[in-house]
Every structure is written in C-alpha cells, then in structure tokens.
C-alpha cells in the first residue's frame, strides 16, 4: 500500500521507461500557443514554457532532456535565444538513440553557428558520427552530414574536411551524395580544401551512381557562381556530359554551369553554342528549352549581329508567351528584354505579341512587358501602344473564370510605371518617333490629369521635364505648348498635387514670356499666389516674374503709371518672401526686391514718358545675353571636371582698367530690350553699330554696303548651327490666340489670362508635319556623355526591406593559383587557446567562491552562540555548489564519449 502513496516524481520516473510521459510535449506547446487570445497572453505563456524548459533540460533523463531541447528549438523561431543550452544540446547529440540524436543535430544547426567554442568541442563527436560502423548506421551519418552543412565555420571546415573526402569513397551512394553536398558549405568557408583535394572531388563526376554525379554537378554549379576560375579546366569533361547525359535535371545544371563559365571564358561560345541550339531544337522539355535560351543570353553567347541564333531563341520564346502558364509567360518576357538589350532589332518584329502581353490578365506580366516597348516602338506604332496603355487608366478589364466575371485590379505601382514608360518611349532618340507634336502635347496634359491621384512623387518631375523639353527643343510649336502650359498653371489640382509640373510650367512662362500678350496679368497672378507655393517652387517663381516683367516693360506701348502700379504689387509679396525659412528663396527674393525698389525710385524720379535705363538696358541684360540651348542632363557636372580656372592672372591690367573707366560709350554685348525671343535670333549686336534710340549716346549710320556685309557675315556664322532659326522659320512662327488653340477645352472665367497676340486667327485643318527638333548641344569636345552620372531620384523601388540571404564566404576572393603552404596552420594552437580560456574561467569561478566563503565566515565570527553550526551550514552550502559544478562537468565529458 505504500506504493499508492509514493511521491509523484517517483511514479513518473517509473513510468517513463514504458513510454508514459507527463511533461508537455511539442504538440502541447503548439496547442497552447494557438489557444492564446492576445499578444500579452502569448508572451506570458511563452515565458512560462521557457522557464519550464530550463528546468527540464537539466534533468538526467535523456527523454526529458530531448523533449526540452525540441521545445527550445521551436521557441527559438519566436526569437528566444537558446545558446545558453548549447552544452545540453551537445549531450543530446551524443545520444546513441537515433531519434534523440536527430533532435540534437536539429537544435545544433540553429544555435551552434553563433558559438565557435562549442563547435570545437563537437568536432570529435562529428568525426565519430561520420565514421561508418555496425553501430553507426547510414541514416545516422546522413543526419550528421545534414547538421554539419548548417553549422559549418572556417575552423570546423578545416578540421572536418579530410573526413568528408574519405566518405567520398564509401560503398553507399547515399553517403557519397550527402558528402558531396556537405562539401559545398565546407568549400565556401575553407577554399583551401578545394584547392588541395580538387582531383578527389572532380572524380565524383565519373561516379557510377547518377545521383552522385547530379549532386557533384550541382555543387560545382553553385561554386562557380562565387569563383568560376578553377572549373574552366573541366570544360571538356562537362561538354561530353552535356552530349551524353539524358537526365534533364543534370542537363539543366550543366547549362547553368556553362552560363557561369562562359562569362569569363569567351572561347567556350564557339564550342558550346551549336550544341545548345541543337539541344534546344531536339528536346521537348520546356525547362530544358528555357534554360538553353537562358544559357545563350546570360552566357554572352549571343552577339549583336547573330540574327540566326536570336531568331531561334525568340521563336521558342514566342511560343512560351502564348502558353497558359503565367510563370512561363513572365520568364519569357524577362528573356525577351535581355535579348532586346543586346540588339533592339532582334525584337522589332514582335509588336503584335507585345500588344497582346500588355493586356495580359497577370499584371506582373504587363509590368515586365513595359520594359520591352523601347525596342519595338517606331513612329508607325507609337500611337497604338500609347493608346493601349491609356485605356488601362480608364477601362476596367475583366476576366471570366468558371462562368463568373472578375475585374482586374490595376495596382498603383503599375500605373506609375506606365506613365514612366510612355515618357521614355516618346522622348527616346530625341523624339524621333513622334510625328504629331500637337498630339504629344495633349498627351502630356492627359498624363498630368491621371497622375494627380498617384502617390509617386517622381511623376510630376518627369512630366514637367517633358513639357520643358518640348518648349526648348521644338521652337515651331512653342505657342501651342505655351497654351497648354497656361491651362496647367490655372488648374488648382495641378497646383496642389503636382508641384513638379507647375515648377517647370512657371519656368517656361518666364523664359518664353515674349509670346504672351497680357503679361501684366500673369505677373499679378504669380505674385499673388507666391505664398501658396512650396519653397522649391518659389525659387523658380521669382526669376520667372522678373523675366515676364522685363518683356512687358519693354513692349512698344506700355503706360508708365501702369508699370509703377504693377511694380508696387510685385514688391509686396517679395517683402514676405525675404523672411522665408529657405535660404535660396531669401537670397533670390532679396535680390529681386532691391532691384525693383531701385526701378520704382527711377520711375518716380523720371517725369518723362521714357523708361529708365534700369528697365530698358539693365534688366533685359540679365536674361537675354545668350540663346538658350539644350544640353544632356549631367553635362554641366561633367564639364566642371575638365575646366581649369586660372586664379593668378589678373582679369584686367591697370591700363585696361583705366581705359574702361574713361570710356563713356555704351556697354558692349547688351541685347536690345525691344527684341523678343524669336526676333533676337535674327538681330545681333554689332560692335560699332548704334543701339536703339533709347538713350542719348551718339550714333553712326551704317551704309547699305556695310549692312549687307554684316548680314552676310551673320549668315555664314549661323550656317550649321542648329540653335538658330532661319529667317524663313522666324517668319513662319505665328503668335496665335491660345483660346483658339484650345477650342475643345472648356471656357474659363479667367479667359483674359490666356490670350496671345495674334496676327491671324484663321483656323485651318493642320496636317501632320515633321517639325525640326533641336539636338542636345556638345559643349566641349571630349566630354563623354556616357560617363555622365545622373543624381536625380530613380523610380526603381528600394531594396532596403529585402532579406539578405547571401552568407559570408572566403571563396569569392580566394586565389587558387597560390601554392599550398604547409606552415599555415598548427592544430594545437586553437586547442591550447581553448584550454587557457577554460582554465581562466575556472580560476575566476574558484576565486569568486572563495571570496564568498570568507565573507560568510567573518560575519559568523561576531556571534558567540551557534557560531560553529553557522560555519558548518555555510560550508555545507558552499561545498555542494562546487561539487555540483564538478558533477555537471563530469556528466558532460562522458556524454561526449558515449558510444
């Protein structure tokens, strides 16, 4: 009867040999986690389970210890550190039972890589488990090899490398295959092992078992991604395997391997390419065909003039793009893009296929197809492609599945990518594919409208740049473009949502303000709204107002009183901008404010009807000194590197300075204020010629012969210069009414702001005429625009949230030509360091225990009664602690040597 009242722990201990456990298993842990209702309850539950595992893992029973290690391994995935239990994991690894050993290796693969010291203790255990014997079955060796691959370090790889090479000669194909795959991680950490045992490893390519050959080819393929140089010598063997092997998996791995090798050895192309093309035609396996094309493209085997190989690849990809498998269609689009980058003529005839892919049910395929447009767009199909893309902003695509219709949701990132793609294909090659620029101007306006609801901030900048480029590069349509710009500036939605577009539009208004009729009203509009704009926009607004103000003041008929009133209206908002938080706005507003105040004082002092020189001569000289020319983005930054500034030579000598001060004539180089942007192209300042009749300086009348000579010389200078318009072109530029150009637009209440001076308002049906587009200027010979970097933000998504799975290895930078040095490594050094570390740790523990015992004895000496018993108690408490430590250490060491 006494057994009925035995302690609970004793009953559990007796029942465990029969397979009856009362501790919580991994299944109970998972059920408990799923039953928690809140994060707080889950955290409390996990903390309680972790404390239970800390007690269970110290138990002498290996079943309980294994169960605790298994639960700790699961909790490690929740972020709980289990490195404190590494010694207990090592004990479980040393168990003779396969189930317990497997749990130990699983836990070791998750925690041992953080602690190199414990791996040094586990080296002998690994070597013992890797040796085949009657007591050590094949599956046990497989578990050890799998665990080794997950926790290998440079030191462990060095110690275990020879044992793995011995396993390559095992009679069991399973062992040879597992050993080959384990060598992959070993070679990454210890490339000397590959260098010293290269022949032994390569011999597995001729193994009798196909699985071993497949594993060897796979390992070589993965190693070649890091350092392909040592495997080039294997090309003849691999080539013969590619011809003879029938296994598709091995063929795919061989093709991937040749892809890596051909990138550094161009001579392989001549030998490999014909066989790959033959394999691509003979096989029916889609995976092999795709990998063959990928090998040709990524292995640099396809030259830009090899049309036969390109056609063979593209025909196969065309069939893949019509497949029902969306994954195959996407991968085919990727290869289409890579082939198009080699030579765009290769994919020029696949416009029908690309049009079909642009409306694919899979949006990811549509997104990838957008990258193909650059290679197939011509002036004949540009409009079709753009219209197909614009319809996706308006129409709702539907798909029918099981007689049910589902609408295709177009994500925002794809809409942004469509707008970027439209801007790219229309502007490429200096707008060579655009035949109707009026259509293109209307297209940019539509894109501005559909971009208002998108969050991509780069769209506004991109569209604004396109509008600005049209104004600069297409002078024949500046009036039409300016009419569209006026509508965009008036739009409140553009002002609020697309400040990047508004910035470029305001710049165009200022730069080409001579085409505007009612300039004073534009000045007032921009000045009044200056407070509503962002600082980046205000930086452009201030000089734009001055440009419009300059052209307006120098018109033929302007009331002086009106000029004074408008000047005062400009000064008021500028006084508010000088206290802006943006330094650039402060500087520009201060400069403009001081100059306008001087102009206002000059207007007040001068009682005559003529304007002061500040308005007629000085202000126009700020902006009309040079003809604006388009240059490639980034050229100015590249140009600064080639300019040398001489800071030693004086700018003017004393005699030249005295002569300059004594000269009372007008300053050379000032452009007449009466000349507009287009008129300035046909009139040029001539030294010695009299300026306009604005001042009182003496004039010299030129004879007819002199004028003809000057005109002839000017024509000769402008021959071949694309940045000057011919006289016929200048005369053909008409200033038409913007309201007439925008006849299809809705009438606005502020229609007076959009009038242009018109010479003829007759409406005629316009024909599509190829207009002249100004090319980018070459500022300095020798500046390579290909080397110019662009610092503007890219619309490529950032990769900061991606998980970096690339592990550190020594194979990438290892030099296989370096001979082996026998004195590189002394195996006793690391062992001696470990012994010294443990000895130092033991001394620290003993000193801490001794100090604690002395303190207790001193305290107990003060009391006379019970001093001996107290000393005995203190010593009895201190001694078991040391014995317990020795016992734990003694228990660990036998566990490491248990058979």
UniProtKB/Swiss-Prot annotation:
Entry coiled-coil feature ranges: 841-862
GO biological process: Golgi to vacuole transport; protein targeting to vacuole
Gene3D superfamilies noted in UniProt: Leucine-rich Repeat Variant
Compartments where located: Golgi apparatus; Cytoplasmic vesicle, Clathrin-coated vesicle membrane
HEAT repeat residue numbers: 37-74, 155-192, 194-229, 231-267, 268-305, 308-344, 345-382, 384-428, 480-518, 536-580, 590-613, 614-656
Keywords: Coiled coil, Cytoplasmic vesicle, Golgi apparatus, Membrane, Protein transport, Repeat, Transport
GO cellular component: AP-3 adaptor complex; clathrin-coated vesicle membrane; endosome membrane; Golgi apparatus
Source taxon at top rank: Eukaryota
Biased composition range(s): Basic residues: 857-880
Composition bias, Low complexity: 743-759
SUPFAM superfamilies recorded: ARM repeat
Main location (coarse class): Golgi
Disordered: region residues: 668-701, 741-768, 782-801, 849-899
Function recorded in the entry: Part of the AP-3 complex, an adaptor-related complex which is not clathrin-associated. The complex is associated with the Golgi region as well as more peripheral structures. It facilitates the budding of vesicles from the Golgi membrane and may be directly involved in trafficking to the vacuole.
Family: Belongs to the adaptor complexes large subunit family.
Protein name according to UniProt: AP-3 complex subunit delta
Record organism: Eremothecium gossypii (strain ATCC 10895 / CBS 109.51 / FGSC 9923 / NRRL Y-1056)
Source species taxonomy: Eukaryota, Fungi, Dikarya, Ascomycota, Saccharomycotina
């Amino acid at each position: 009867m006494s057994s009925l009242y035995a302690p609970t722990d004793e009953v559990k201990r007796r029942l465990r040999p029969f397979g009856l456990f009362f501790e919580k298993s991994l299944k109970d842990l998972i059920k408990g986690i799923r039953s928690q209702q809140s994060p707080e309850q889950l955290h409390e539950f996990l903390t309680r389970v972790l404390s239970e595992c800390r007690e269970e893992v110290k138990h002498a029973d290996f079943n309980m210890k294994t169960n605790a290690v298994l639960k700790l391994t699961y909790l490690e995935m929740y972020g709980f550190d289990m490195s404190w239990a590494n010694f207990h994991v090592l004990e479980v690894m040393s168990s003779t039972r396969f189930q317990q050993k497997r749990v130990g290796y699983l836990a070791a693969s998750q925690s041992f890589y953080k602690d190199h010291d414990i791996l040094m203790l586990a080296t002998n255990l690994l070597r013992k488990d890797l040796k085949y014997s009657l007591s050590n079955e094949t599956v046990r060796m497989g578990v050890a090899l799998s665990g080794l691959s997950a926790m290998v370090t440079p030191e462990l790889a060095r110690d275990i490398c020879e044992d793995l090479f011995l396993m390559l000669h095992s009679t069991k194909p399973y062992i040879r295959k597992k050993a080959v795959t384990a060598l992959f991680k070993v070679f990454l950490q210890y490339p000397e092992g590959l260098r010293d045992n290269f022949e032994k490893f390569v011999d597995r390519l001729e193994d009798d078992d196909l699985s071993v050959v497949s594993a060897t080819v796979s390992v070589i393929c993965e190693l070649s991604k890091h350092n392909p140089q040592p495997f080039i010598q294997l090309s003849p063997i691999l080539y013969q395997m590619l011809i003879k092997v029938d296994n598709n998996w091995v063929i795919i791995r061989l093709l991937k391997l040749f892809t890596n090798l051909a990138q550094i050895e161009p001579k392989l192309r001549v030998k490999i390419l014909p066989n790959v093309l033959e394999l691509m035609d003979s096989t029916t396996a889609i995976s092999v065909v795709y990998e063959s094309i990928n090998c040709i493209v990524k292995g640099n085997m396809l030259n830009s003039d090899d049309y036969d190989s390109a056609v063979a690849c593209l025909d196969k990809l065309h069939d893949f793009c019509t497949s029902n498998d969306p994954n195959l269609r996407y991968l085919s689009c990727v290869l289409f893009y890579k082939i198009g980058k080699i030579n765009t003529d290769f994919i020029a005839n696949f416009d029908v296929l690309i049009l079909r892919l642009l409306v694919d049910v899979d949006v990811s395929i549509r997104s990838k197809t957008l990258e193909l447009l650059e290679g197939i767009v011509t002036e004949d199909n540009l409009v079709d492609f753009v219209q197909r893309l614009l319809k996706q902003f308006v129409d709702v695509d539907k798909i029918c599945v099981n007689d049910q219709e589902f609408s295709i949701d177009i994500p925002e990132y794809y809409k942004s990518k469509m707008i970027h793609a439209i801007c790219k294909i229309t502007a490429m090659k200096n707008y060579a594919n655009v035949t109707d620029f009026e259509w293109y101007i209307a297209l940019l306006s539509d894109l501005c409208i559909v971009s208002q609801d998108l969050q991509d901030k780069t769209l506004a900048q991109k569209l604004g740049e396109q509008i600005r480029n049209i104004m600069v590069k297409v002078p024949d349509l500046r009036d039409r473009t300016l009419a569209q710009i006026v509508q965009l500036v008036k739009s409140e939605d553009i002002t609020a949502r697309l400040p990047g577009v508004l910035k470029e539009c305001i710049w165009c208004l200022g730069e080409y303000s001579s085409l505007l009729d009612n300039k004073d009203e534009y000045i007032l509009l921009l000045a009044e709204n200056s407070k509503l704009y962002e600082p980046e926009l205000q930086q452009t607004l201030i000089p734009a107002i001055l440009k419009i103000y300059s052209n307006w003041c120098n018109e033929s008929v302007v009331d002086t009183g009106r000029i004074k009133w408008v000047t005062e209206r400009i000064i008021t908002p500028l006084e508010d901008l000088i206290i802006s938080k943006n330094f650039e706005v402060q500087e520009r507003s201060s400069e403009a404010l001081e100059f306008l105040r001087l102009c206002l004082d000059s207007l007040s002092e001068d009682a005559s009807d003529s304007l002061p020189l500040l308005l007629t001569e000085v202000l126009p000289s700020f902006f009309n000194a040079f003809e604006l020319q388009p240059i490639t983005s980034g050229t100015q930054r590249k140009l600064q590197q080639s300019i040398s500034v001489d800071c030693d030579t004086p700018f003017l000598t004393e005699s030249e300075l005295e002569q300059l001060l004594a000269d009372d004539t007008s300053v050379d180089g000032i452009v007449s204020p009466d000349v507009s942007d287009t008129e300035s192209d046909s009139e040029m300042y001539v030294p010695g010629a009299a300026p306009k009749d604005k001042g009182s300086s003496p004039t010299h009348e030129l004879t007819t012969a002199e004028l003809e000579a000057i005109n002839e010389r000017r024509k000769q200078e402008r021959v071949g210069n694309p940045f000057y318009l011919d006289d016929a072109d200048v005369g053909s530029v008409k200033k038409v009414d913007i309201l007439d150009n925008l006849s299809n637009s809705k009438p606005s209440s502020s229609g007076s702001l959009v009038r242009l001076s018109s010479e003829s308002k007759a409406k005629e049906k316009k024909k599509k005429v190829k207009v002249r587009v100004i090319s980018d200027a070459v500022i300095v010979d020798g500046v390579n625009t290909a080397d110019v970097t662009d610092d503007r933000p890219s619309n490529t998504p950032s990769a900061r949230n991606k998980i970096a799975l690339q592990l550190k290895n020594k194979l990438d930078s290892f030099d296989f030509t370096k001979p082996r040095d026998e004195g590189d490594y002394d195996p006793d050094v690391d062992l001696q360091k470990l012994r010294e570390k443990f000895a130092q740790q033991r001394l620290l523990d003993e000193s801490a225990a001794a100090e604690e015992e002395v303190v207790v004895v001193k305290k107990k000496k003060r009391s006379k009664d019970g001093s001996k018993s107290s000393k005995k108690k203190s010593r009895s408490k201190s001694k078991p602690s040391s014995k317990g430590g020795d016992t734990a250490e003694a228990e660990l060491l036998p566990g490491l040597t248990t058979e």
